[in-house]
Regions:
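Non-heme Fe(II)/2-oxoglutarate
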Residues: 1-88
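Catalytic core of non-heme Fe(II) oxygenases with the double-stranded beta-helix
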Residues: 61-155
């Protein structure tokens, strides 16, 4: 895992923030940001649902949203930041997420452990997270790569 601070120039970071928080950007509701509705019944009761919003700007095989052009540059920045060969990697998905703050007495440090994009788990890949704000705390990464009875926090 690598953490890259100041990944974007400030002016570009501000532009992305303003687009995502404008009243023109289309967000779509998710009952739970960690699992699909079909998988929710498999989640232990102590991990309550974490609602949020999403917008998938690009998904391999599904096409582009009208906002794809506003986010497509991320791929090139990532390739450069990770020093990868551009012709050896391809883009699988660009997904914007907006998680809501969690206000519960039993608030955990993390949500249900999950894989962000299960379709990509069969091949070597990178998952890159870019935070526009800090509305719901840090992302937690676990040592375990398979479903487990107990999870160990890696980061």
């Amino acid at each position: 895992m690598r953490e890259i601070h100041n990944f974007l120039p400030i002016s570009l970071a501000n532009e992305i923030h303003d687009k995502l928080t404008s009243n023109e950007f289309p967000w779509f509701w998710l009952d739970d940001v960690t699992v699909s509705p079909e998988e929710r019944s498999e989640v232990p009761d102590f991990y309550r649902s974490q609602p949020g919003m999403h917008h998938t700007a690009y998904r391999d095989g599904s096409g582009l949203s009208n906002w794809y052009g506003d986010f497509s540059f991320f791929y090139h920045y990532i390739i450069d930041a990770l020093n990868l060969e551009w012709d050896q990697w391809y883009l699988s998905r660009i997904r914007c997420g907006l998680n809501f703050p969690t206000f519960r007495e039993e608030h955990f440090l993390h949500n249900q452990p999950h894989v962000d994009f299960p379709e990509s788990s069969q091949v070597d890949h990178f998952t890159c997270l870019y935070y526009v704000n800090n509305s719901d705390g840090p992302t937690v990464v676990f040592e375990e790569k398979e479903q487990s009875e107990k999870y160990t926090i890696k980061y």
